[in-house]
Amino acid sequence: MTLDGFTHEHPYRSSFGFLLVVVAVVLAVGLIGERFLMGSLVQVAVVDLALAIIGIFLLARLGWWGKAGYTTGIRLAHVPLFILPIAVGLVSLGQGIRVTAPLVVLSFAGLTLLVGFAEETFFRGLILTALLPAGTIGAVVLSSFLFAAPHLLNVIGGTWDPAFTLVDSVAAFGLGITFAAIRLRTGSIWPLVGIHALFDFTSLVALGGVEVPAQSPQVLLASVVIGIVFVLYGLFLLRKELITATPDANT
């Protein structure tokens, strides 16, 4: 049986297998980083470079470049779909900008593009595509849950405040719903790579790094609200699929 055939027959095993690759890389680099005293940003770069390479290899083996949205460009008619996530992605700049040195800003931009490519390759490219044979709505929800779960790893080593880590995972679940919906509506993964990079870039220049200290109750609540908004927006984009999936009460 080919790898593509296996993923089609076993969507859940395949999706969890892809997730295990992500978790294994994150934990392995974390252990190596502690031993060799890697900085947090270096660890992020190493993790996502490894995931990007592995993701490209898997896409090539599966022959999923088209199915995962890499061969479809961005249509002008789809641009309005991106307005809400882009606007939310810019919210971090309301806290101020701590990083202004041109070389640092450029390095952050390069790093976040790498992160966007690597994470979208796994979660909206490999995992979402693997789950689609089991049903569109189920694939969107489960892939979003699997996207949110690894965010909990940010609490390891004290990189993120525990309370913020929890609410950020809620926001990540909502963002996953919206991203999956956009991926299915547009047929392209490229807008998500850019928007994902925007979220991470604005956070980096606002915080000055990847460490997140304790946040105010207002910020924590806002993160939960953002997650809920993204869930609703994503489901709105998928309303036709929701109607199709709902049995007719008269039948």
Q: Which ranges hold each PLM region?
A:
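C-terminal membrane module of polytopic membrane proteins
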Residues: G39, A197-T251
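Membrane-interface helix/loop boundary segments of multi-pass membrane proteins
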Residues: A118-S144, G158, L184-S188
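Membrane-interface helix caps and helix-loop-helix hairpins in membrane proteins
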Residues: F36-G39, S92-L103, G158-P162, V210-P217
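Membrane-embedded alpha-helical segments in integral membrane proteins
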Residues: V21-M38, I86-G96, A148-L152, D200
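Alpha-helical transmembrane segments in multi-pass membrane proteins
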Residues: P11-A60, R75-I83, P102, L106-S107, ...
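Cytoplasmic-side transmembrane-helix entry/capping segments in multi-pass membrane proteins
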Residues: T72-L81, S107, L132-L142, P191, ...
